[in-house]
Amino acid sequence: MPTALTHEYRVRKNFGKIHKIIDIPNLIQMQKESYELFLQRDVPSEARSERGLQEVFKSVFPIEDFSGTASLEFVQYSFGEVKYEVEECLARGMTYEAPVKIVVRLVVYDVDKEAGTRSIRDIKEQEIYFGTLPLMTDNGTFIINGTERVIVSQLHRSPGIFFDHDRGKTHSSGKILYSARIIPLRGSWLDLEFDPKDILYIRIDRRRKFPVTVLLKALGYATEELLNYFYPSEKIFLKSEAQSEKELNPDILMGSRAPEDILHPQTGEVLIKKNRKLGKQALRRLQEVGINRLPMKSTELIGQVLAQDVIDYGTGEIVAECNDSIDADMLKEFVERGVGEIELLHLEGQDVSPSFRNTLLMDKVNTQEDALIEIYRRLRPSNPPTLEVATEFFNNLFFNPDHYDLSEVGRLKLNLQLGLEVPLDYRTLRKDDILMAVRQLIRLKDSQGPVDDIDNLGNRRVRAVGELLENQYRIGLVRMERAIKERMTLQEVEALMPHDLINAKPVSAVVKEFFGTSQLSQFMDQTNPLSEITHKRRLSALGPGGLTRERAGFEVRDVHPTHYGRICPIETPEGPNIGLIVSLSTYARVNPYGFIETPYRKVDGSSARKDVSYLTAMDEKEYPIAQANAPLDEKGRFLLDLVSARVAGEPVMVPPNEIRYMDVSPNQLVSVSASLIPFLEHDDANRALMGSNMQRQAVPLIQTRAPLVGTGIERIVAKDSGVAIVARRTGVVEYVDATRIVIRAIEDNGEMGSGVDIYKLIKFQRSNQNTCINQKPLVQHGDLVTKGQIIADGPSTDHGELALGRNVMVAFMSWGGYNFEDSILVSERIGKEDVFTSIHIEEFEVVARDTKLGKEDITRDIPNVGEEALKNLDESGIIRVGAYIKPNDILVGKVTPKGESQLTPEEKLLRAIFGEKASDVKDTSLRVPPGVEGIIIDAKVFSRKGVEKDERTKTIEDQEISRLMKDQRDELEIIFKSTVKRLAKLLENQVSDSAIKDGKKVYIKKGEVFTEEILLNLPSGHWDQLTVAKDPTVSMEIENILANYREQVQLVKSLFEEKIGKLKRGDELPPGVIKMVKVYVAVKRKLQVGDKMAGRHGNKGVVSRILPAEDMPYFPDGTPVDIVLNPLGVPSRMNVGQVLETHIGWAAKGIGMQLAQMLEECRERETMNEKLQRIYNKLEFGTYFKDASERELRGLIPDFKEGIHVASPVFDGAEEAEIRAFLSEAGVSETGQSVLYDGRTGMPFDQPVTVGVMYMLKLHHLVDDKIHARSIGPYSLVTQQPLGGKAQFGGQRLGEMEVWTMEAYGAAYALQEFLTVKSDDVAGRTRMYEKIVKGDNTLEAGLPESFNVLVKELQALALDVRLLEEEEGN
């Protein structure tokens, strides 16, 4: 049984002190889960939940015609089989998609208009093809037209209600104006806002504002009802014109002053003197002595507002209306008419203002009908309003699910903000919602309370792939719905079938547009595995329904306290998108409502538990949360009396018993990229940002090496990115080579199963960024592998760990000015040993079309091309694999027919003599573009169905078939062997009941005991003759085993035949294309001057010189350093992490060399163990080394020679004392410095130099991709100057400043040449060419074309510019 040492492949010494609580969730889970929930592809139709596609179909169907005579109902949807697998789609330029079929039911009714009823006349059900939907690959990407794309998740403002104010910026007085906004997922926005006069207005869809009371009246509320809802009322008992009494209401009277002395009813003593403040105690005393009314002067009532209509019950007449102000005459009339009591609105007091009453006074609309018509008139000014139309329009605005959808999230936010308990599936507005929103806003204004923060992650949510596509699909279905309704009306429905009504084109078009051109559908960044993973975990605030770069301010872009553990504060692009495009943190996940959650350990009674809760930003705001590095004892109790914690994002010191939660890990704060940077805690944030961004640009190298100094999550990134191959089941490796691994699976009960897993390795495939994707097996024949084990490395992975660069020996010192301004001095050894060499793959494509003049042909027979140029082409005209090519070489020979041109008499004569017909085609071969040099690694040919295949196609087809045959053979052999094993186990010690023979050959004699060897030699065709003496049950079991075997064999064969059939069928090509050839060229790029390199701490630079190894500074033992960096690049950048990495890297290298030496010298195991125990902690030593055999340890020698691997987790890394101890263990100076000698003179440098091992990356900005040279090339049409840029094969611009330098040197003729014949003097160019041919090198400059352009521009401005030609001699 292999030990953990061989199983894990790589042991890392971990400097972290904090134990792992939970595993990091799968890094691309968000993408995959979202799309699975959208499709619900593997869920039976009756069990599908109301979300994604199901919800869209249910919300649009049933579709009824305008008269109600027919209805089209949705029954279910299903997916068909995928036509092409992922690899085929990538090769052929197809989309990886599955057809969608829907079952719909057309119900036709008989309508009885008089009775108002309808009865079913006819029901027709039919399955209809409904276009296709792209499927997601296992790695969370989509393949659209042969390219891998990623749908980036969008971070947008959550639907719901938000309260805000203008911070005093709107009005000149600086008064704070409060506002509220109800945002639905779909439908009209509702804005409530105060003006400077405290009148409350409302806007619908940002149109003209009108008083909020108009809307409330349209909802059916009366004036009196509204006033009593917003204001408390108090009863007044009128005695006379001079004296009255008011009811004792503690809620209203609290804090007011006594109008007169208040006397005890029995004793007559003064309880409360006049003008004394009425507090809680005073009011309670009054109630205790039985005082229910307080005396007041009637004159105090003047100016107060009535809460109800005042009615003279004698006559039934309304004396005064609700909301009227009382004046002296009115008061007199009340007394005269004998009105005993009135109710007044309480408008003055704490947190109460008359703003709503003032709004009502301003509002001239009195009835609900008027209000509805007023709203209709405001929103539809051009349409004539009628009450019926206005009512329907108003109801559709907020109360019709077809037009308005708050979404579950919107309802959730509304319930939380307004304190409601409405079910989440109630997704339109209610009357109460609007009323309560108005009341909440008025309360907020009166109390000057806090408003919502729109940048809080509780108010922003993530829309992942599923939801984005769901919204698009709905748009397509709504377009289709209109067309269906029109068809139902125009045609006789009885005669129609469902397929006559449904046309899926609008839906397909919307889906195609979304995947092809949406801002959120992006070409995947596939430079290396990390760039893939970060692209899938990216969140963008841009895109449809989001922000735009120009409008986004600082607040949206800034880091917010709620980002903690949810969004990385470091990883974001530099430039205009900073802060708008962010990355999900390591442990973060998105909940069903789209809010980002982060995990916390629960804390009970000041001790941390092992179980974890996921909290959103809204959930965590009231809890104190401790940090992951808070000191705990073995039982999880806090050691300190005051613990550093966060409450609502603010740092505080809290006693342990108050803490409710604790972070799970120090790196939960940052994203995957940032958590790959060791000693991140010692880097300045700006440099950490560059470091995490530049790791994504690292090019995969030929020889991958994991970093000596890592952080411990390299393995997780490699596994989750999908570039490394992970074993699907436990099993034994039966066969392994560079292109495939065959594993025989072991059943769960430990028995050898008959299952076979064949893993095909990707060999030298081109990525989106032209880097090379190549997989290498890590297992050997006979190895036992467990489920989830990494069995093959991909690009930029080393033994299942992410490996973006190389560990190199660096020195921080200046060297001859070659590391000025971040330049990097590199040793020649790096080029010789291919340390930073990478392979880049270019794809070239040529298409033969059927043109109007005839068919283009791919052929070796090309006019006017010598045999030398054709030497590498095969008989089909396609270059052979392995050929070395240079610019302008022919890759694929192609000729195109050209139109018959008028022949000269000479040509006619030649034609007549030689009968030559070759000149009617022209050479349009695919040639190598400038700047590309490399080796052909593959050529793929696609021919249209029905076109005869050429030799090359047949050869490629034969190779593919033989590969498939090999797979089939292996699979059948494993099934055969495992069946034999099962039979042998069943027939152990059993005796054959009869002889089995084939002709004269006897396989088993009668009475012979069965053995595995006998059964292996027995052909499977004779297995049904196996019989056992005395045991009929065994025969039954044999029958079952045989049936199982035949079934598996049949399955394998049918799959194989299907694949071969697919191969032999012609290819689907675009219209007019006969044949398409793709040629792949591998270009090997060594590190050279001008290439950009970087460390992981934002320390980037350009290679300035490659120096012979013997000239590089060297150690006292003669070892030269590999790279010399500028020490001035550290202090001002404040990325000290690189220095600590260098120190610990040096120690790791030294210790590794010591261990390798000890193993080579075969030291005693005791000594070896002591050394290992000093380096590794108890757990690591116990797990990996304690039980390892001598052979296993010796197998680590090559690894140890490069150094031992260490992990310094983010925010929990190695401390200074540990680094010092590590350096002294390695036997080097604790200062991390060494004396270096100058390679040129052999003299030591004056001072010791900081040296060590740093992990360096080669970035994608390669000089070969940027540099080019132009001799003769294309010119711009208008100015006739050479084009610019490498893509256009342009020249360098000689601009204004360059002209000044030439003038300064007085180089007039050189300058004249630059500005005329070498640039845009067309006639002069031609003359110059002729002169050079004749051997005359004199210059005769003419008029530059740009001067003519200037003249034409001036003429366009109506200036009459003419050139006056002077005659010579005047």
UniProtKB/Swiss-Prot annotation:
Belongs to the RNA polymerase beta chain family. One of its GO terms (cellular component) is DNA-directed RNA polymerase complex. The RNAP catalytic core consists of 2 alpha, 1 beta, 1 beta' and 1 omega subunit. When a sigma factor is associated with the core the holoenzyme is formed, which can initiate transcription. It holds the Pfam family RNA_pol_Rpb2_6. Its EC number is 2.7.7.6. It catalyses: RNA(n) + a ribonucleoside 5'-triphosphate = RNA(n+1) + diphosphate. GO terms for biological process: DNA-templated transcription. GO terms for molecular function: DNA binding; DNA-directed RNA polymerase activity; ribonucleoside binding. This is DNA-directed RNA polymerase subunit beta. InterPro entries: DNA-dir_RNA_pol_bsu_ext_1_sf, DNA-dir_RNA_pol_bsu_external_1, DNA-dir_RNA_pol_su2, DNA-dir_RNAP_su2_dom, DNA-dir_RNAP_su2_hyb_sf, RNA_pol_bsu_bac, RNA_pol_bsu_CS, RNA_pol_bsu_protrusion. DNA-dependent RNA polymerase catalyzes the transcription of DNA into RNA using the four ribonucleoside triphosphates as substrates. The keyword Nucleotidyltransferase applies. The lineage of its organism: Bacteria, Pseudomonadati, Thermodesulfobacteriota, Syntrophobacteria, Syntrophobacterales. Disulfide bonds: none annotated.
